[in-house]
Amino acid sequence: MSGSVAAGAAAGPVPPAQEEGMTWWYRWLCRLAGVLGAVSCAISGLFNCVTIHPLNIAAGVWMIMNAFILLLCEAPFCCQFVEFANTVAEKVDRLRSWQKAVFYCGMAIVPIVMSLTLTTLLGNAIAFATGVLYGLSALGKKGDAISYARIQQQRQQADEEKLAETFEGEL
């Protein structure tokens, strides 16, 4: 009895990323974009903090915080000095792709709203792109071009038949 319970617990529910049909290479692409976004946010945030303008400093601190959160969520092995790093990463992995997209894009927009400079734009571009990648995965895979063309052709034939019936009815 305990063996079957342990086996059921080990299998557990399928993570949402796999439910949505996210391929392994796309998942790694999103993670890589998250890590690169964290690095760009951290470096740009440090440059932003070297100023006397208070909004630039606030945006720089926010960007450094974004970098830490991105690393914590996407690459918890980089944050092993934080005791709860793996717990946070597991909880983030259970989120749906659209939730990650909103979270990452929202985090990247805040410093740009605080201080619209080239440093904040370039620093948050990759972090925002990470959110966009997760958003695209939330949209899912659409049909291929051949099936789309076939559907369009069927619609066009149906429209032509309706038009022909309309003209025959007028005569």
Curated annotation (Swiss-Prot):
**Tagged with keyword Secreted:** no
Q: Which residues point to the Cytoplasmic side?
A: 1-31, 78-101, 142-171
Could you list this entry's UniProt keywords, alphabetically sorted: Cell membrane, Cytoplasmic vesicle, Golgi apparatus, Membrane, Synapse, Transmembrane, Transmembrane helix
Question: Could you say what a knockout of this gene produces?
Answer: Knockdown in cultured hippocampal neurons impairs Clathrin-mediated endocytosis (CME) in response to mild stimulation (200 action potentials at 20 Hz) and activity-dependent bulk endocytosis (ADBE) in response to strong stimulation (1,600 action potentials delivered at 80 Hz).
List locations, semicolon-separated.
Cell membrane; Cytoplasmic vesicle, Secretory vesicle, Synaptic vesicle; Golgi apparatus; Vesicle
Record GO cellular component, one term: synaptic vesicle
Q: Cite the record's tissue specificity text.
A: Expressed in calyces in the brain (at protein level). Detected in cultured hippocampal neurons (at protein level).
Entry's family note: Belongs to the calcium channel flower family.
Q: What does this protein do?
A: Transmembrane protein which mediates synaptic endocytosis and fitness-based cell culling. In response to different stimulus strengths, controls two major modes of synaptic vesicle (SV) retrieval in hippocampal neurons; Clathrin-mediated endocytosis (CME) in response to mild stimulation and activity-dependent bulk endocytosis (ADBE) in response to strong stimulation. In cytotoxic T-lymphoocytes (CTLs) facilitates calcium-dependent endocytosis of cytotoxic granules (CGs) at the immuno synapse.
Q: What is this protein called?
A: Calcium channel flower homolog
At the highest ranks, the source species' classification is:
Eukaryota, Metazoa, Chordata, Craniata, Vertebrata
